[in-house]
Amino acid sequence: FGSGFKVKYHENDITTNIEDLGAKIGDRFREFCKSYGRELTLVFEPGKFLVSESGYLLVRTNVIKQTTATVFCGVDSGQNHLIRPMMYDAYHHITNVSNPGGIERIYTVVGYICETDTFGWDRKLNEVREGDVLVLHNAGAYGYSMSSNYNSRYRPAEVLIHNGKAKLIRRRENLDDLLATQIEAEL
């Protein structure tokens, strides 16, 4: 069976009750095996269900820019790190962890890539200031695997939190990483 298990992105999203689903499928599968006269193996490809909610993208605010219609919050990341909002119009909840008690305001959170690089349009966030850290939720699925070095940008580090302790599991890329696969051509 393949993916499709629901993950909660919006507050009122329907999620998959994995225990209930497992019980129902398990019962029917055992009945099928019995009627088929053979023991079979049932395998699931869980997709984003296992990892989406366990990953967060932390970004730092570089600039706040007010226009006549919009307040933009520019951050030090972009679609090269989390392309889902741009590619699929996917919603990722955003939280300002640097100012949890701040007054709610409306921001459009944008990245540093030159195209229309937007993480979230017209989002209610606690007041955002330059230097504040924002958290993009549900970034565990496909974040790294869909990331790129577009515009010669480095991929970020990945940190695992286990039993309250942080452990670096993937270092941030650097210029050597960008150049590592290039071969000097003799012309």
Residue ranges and their predicted role:
Residues F1-G4, S35, L160:
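Short intrinsically disordered, low-complexity coil segments enriched in acidic
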Residues F1-K6, P46-K48:
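Glycine-rich beta-strand-to-loop/alpha-helix junction loops that act as flexible
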Residues H10-E19:
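Glycine-rich tight-turn/loop motif centered on a GG-T
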Residues L21-C33:
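Alpha-helix-loop-beta-strand connector modules within alpha/beta enzyme cores
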Residues G37-L187:
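Charged (often Lys/Glu-rich) extended helix/loop segments that serve as interaction or gating elements
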